[in-house]
Amino acid sequence: MERGTIHNKGSFLSNISKNLQREMPQHVERPEWQYRPQDKTLTGLTQDELLEVLRQQCNFIHTDLVETTTDNINETLSQVIEKYGNGEVIAWNDKRFADFGIDLEAHDAFIWDEAKGAENLQVAERANVGITFSDVTLAESGTVVLYADKGKGRSVSLLPATYIAIVPKSTIVPRFTQAAQQMNAMMEDQENFPTCINLITGPSNSADIEMKLVVGVHGPIKATYIVVDDK
């Protein structure tokens, strides 16, 4: 996956400033807010308490949450895949699968390969199960945050009929505030900044003008978060 290059940024911003009848700013000072409730929300909770908040939120977003350990992760994963009817499996090319001892070969999983180009999309389209890790997990909203990059295509969590997120317990944070802070810190190393950041809150949910819930129109029909104790 090639990183994009921004062209004509200066002239674009200069044109905006000109139409606003001002000089183009060379530096932006972030405002100091008097009140920052976002910094305090849920921050006093332990990791176990955050997990409980996440569990409760999953009930509202039609998502199953399963707890397991590194010793039992393969058995748990097999049970979830079987519950979803088995079928073709696609997963990220992510060293964390090996770190956690997850045996993807047991499910004959297709591993996303940048060199295979369009074949990745074709497999993702027909796959029944897509599996990724969660990089940051937001307890308040039940959201998994995925940092896409080489070997970590967006289609793995988008195109299959069902989706499984492996959630290391240590990745659970109170809310998006903490995720944004992490992203700001990552900006210091722009060479390794993710090519895409996706926030996924359970299966695909849509509603028409009559507010009738429709599941699976823009993504997976079902989703499971497997929370695993870190090594």
UniProtKB/Swiss-Prot annotation:
Official protein name in the record: Lactate utilization protein C
| One family name in Pfam for this protein | LUD_dom
**GO biological process annotations for this chain's record?**
lactate metabolic process
Entry's InterPro entries?
A: FTHF_cligase-like_sf (IPR024185), LUD_dom (IPR003741), LutC (IPR022823), NagB/RpiA_transferase-like (IPR037171)
Organism whose genome encodes this protein: Macrococcus caseolyticus (strain JCSC5402) (Macrococcoides caseolyticum)
Task: Briefly state the protein's biological role.
Answer: Is involved in L-lactate degradation and allows cells to grow with lactate as the sole carbon source.
The entry assigns this protein to a family as follows: Belongs to the LutC/YkgG family.
